[in-house]
């Protein structure tokens, strides 16, 4: 498995993959421009860690976007989105990608990963496999 940083030089490729995945597999209505803007916002953020996952034949299998956030005595990685492309889901690619992210953010000084995910059994099972649990000290406000 190969992990390539998503940078301003490869956003076009990533935006196309992102748009196609959500439009084909999730009934999305993404345009290339909106996908490009979303990925670029994360990539250009200070202390971002955004990766493209590719198999050994250089075929993209997924991506992760997020950033490190620092406080006076604590740094965490906010995992904004992890995406495994449709045909690669439920084959261990997500586990490998999150393991890679864990290693890289620890090397950069993060003590933990924080995220918001859908409240369903699939996501709870996936993240629970990494020792993550629902935060009891936070409430989502809208």
Q: Where do the PLM segments sit?
A:
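A short beta-loop-alpha structural element at the N-terminal edge
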Residues: 1-16
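Conserved beta-strand in the GNAT
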Residues: 52, 59-68, 76-78, 83
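A conserved beta-turn-beta hairpin within the catalytic core of GNAT-like acetyltransferases
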Residues: 69-79, 89, 133-135
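Conserved hydrophobic beta-strand within the GNAT/NAT acetyltransferase core sheet
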Residues: 79, 113-117
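Conserved GNAT-fold acetyl-CoA-binding loop/helix
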Residues: 8, 19-40
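Conserved acetyl-CoA-binding loop-helix of GNAT-fold acetyltransferases
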Residues: 84, 90-103, 129
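A short helix-loop-beta-strand connector motif used in the catalytic cores of GNAT acetyltransferases and
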Residues: 40-52
């Amino acid at each position: 498995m190969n992990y390539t940083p998503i940078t301003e030089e490869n956003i076009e490729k990533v935006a196309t993959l992102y748009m196609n995945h959500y439009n084909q597999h999730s009934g999305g209505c993404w345009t290339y421009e909106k996908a490009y803007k979303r990925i670029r916002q994360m990539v250009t953020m200070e202390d971002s860690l955004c990766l493209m996952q590719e198999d050994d034949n250089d075929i993209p299998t997924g991506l992760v976007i997020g950033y490190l956030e620092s406080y006076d005595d604590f740094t965490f990685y906010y995992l904004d989105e992890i995406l495994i492309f449709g045909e690669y889901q439920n084959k261990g690619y997500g586990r490998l990608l999150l393991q890679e992210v864990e290693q890289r953010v620890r090397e950069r000084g993060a003590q933990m990963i924080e995220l918001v995910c859908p409240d369903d059994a699939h996501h709870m099972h996936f993240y629970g496999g990494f020792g993550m649990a629902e935060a009891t000290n936070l409430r989502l406000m809208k």
